[in-house]
Amino acid sequence: MTDQPPPSGSNPTPAPPPPGSSGGYEPSFAPSELGSAYPPPTAPPVGGSYPPPPPPGGSYPPPPPPGGSYPPPPPSTGAYAPPPPGPAIRSLPKEAYTFWVTRVLAYVIDNIPATVLLGIGMLIQTLTKQEACVTDITQYNVNQYCATQPTGIGMLAFWFAWLMATAYLVWNYGYRQGATGSSIGKTVMKFKVISEATGQPIGFGMSVVRQLAHFVDAVICCIGFLFPLWDSKRQTLADKIMTTVCLPI
C-alpha cells in the first residue's frame, strides 16, 4: 500500500522542536529578562581560579602577626600602671638639706603626745598605789614591814596609756610620714623625708623600718644622731642605711 498525501483541510504535521530543546514548554520569560536577574558568570582570570567570595556580614578577622606570636592580653579589671618615679636626689648642695636643729625640734614635737599619754598612765598608777604591811612579833621586838604596790586599776591605766602612745607613734612615723613624707613635727617645721632614688615618700613599711634603724644611731652613744652636723647630705646613719634625705617643703 502506497503512502497517500493527507487530504486537504486536515491538521498539518507539527513542526520539529528547535535545536537544544527537550521537547517541553518554552520558558515564559525572554532571555533578556533572565540576563537582567542573574548576571552571567565572569570569565575566570588568568591562572584558572576565581577569587574567594567576600564573607557574609562583614570582613574577615585580621591574620595573626608573623611568627605565631600574639600581643599580650590587656590588664585585668582594676589594675593600674605604676606611677612614674620621681626625680632622683643625688647632687644637691649641703644648704639644700634640712638643718640639724630643725630636725631636733621636729623630733621633740613628734614625741610630745606620746610623752603626755605615758605621763597620764604613770600618774594614775602612782595615785592608786596601795600600802601593804607585815608585822613580825618576836619575844623582844615587834617589827613591821610595809611596801606599796600598784592596784589593778593603776596597772590597767598604765598599759592602756602605753598602747595608745605606741599606736600614735606607729601612725605618725609609719602611716603619716610614709604616705606624705612628713610626720606632725616635720609638718610644723616644714620639711619631709624622701627617698634619694625616687624623690618620693618611702611608704608605711619602709618608714617604720627607718625609725627602727635609728637604733644604730643610738647604740654608738647617740653619735649617729649628730652625723647631720658634718655630713654633706646631713644624713643620720639611719638615713644612709635607708637611702633617705630630709628636704625643706
Swiss-Prot record:
Bilayer topology term: Multi-pass membrane protein
Pfam families to which the protein is assigned, alphabetical: RDD
Alphabetical UniProt keywords: Cell membrane, Membrane, Repeat, Transmembrane, Transmembrane helix
Places the protein is found: Cell membrane
Residue ranges of every copy of the RDD domain listed in the record: 99-242
Extent of Pro residues compositional bias: 1-20, 38-87
Intervals holding Sequence repeats: 34-43, 46-55, 56-65, 66-75, 76-85, 101-123, 134-156
5 X 10 AA tandem repeats of [PV]-G-G-S-Y-P-P-P-P-P, as annotated region: 34-85
Family that this chain belongs to: Belongs to the mycobacterial Pra family.
Name recorded for this polypeptide: Proline-rich antigen
Organism: Mycobacterium leprae (strain TN)
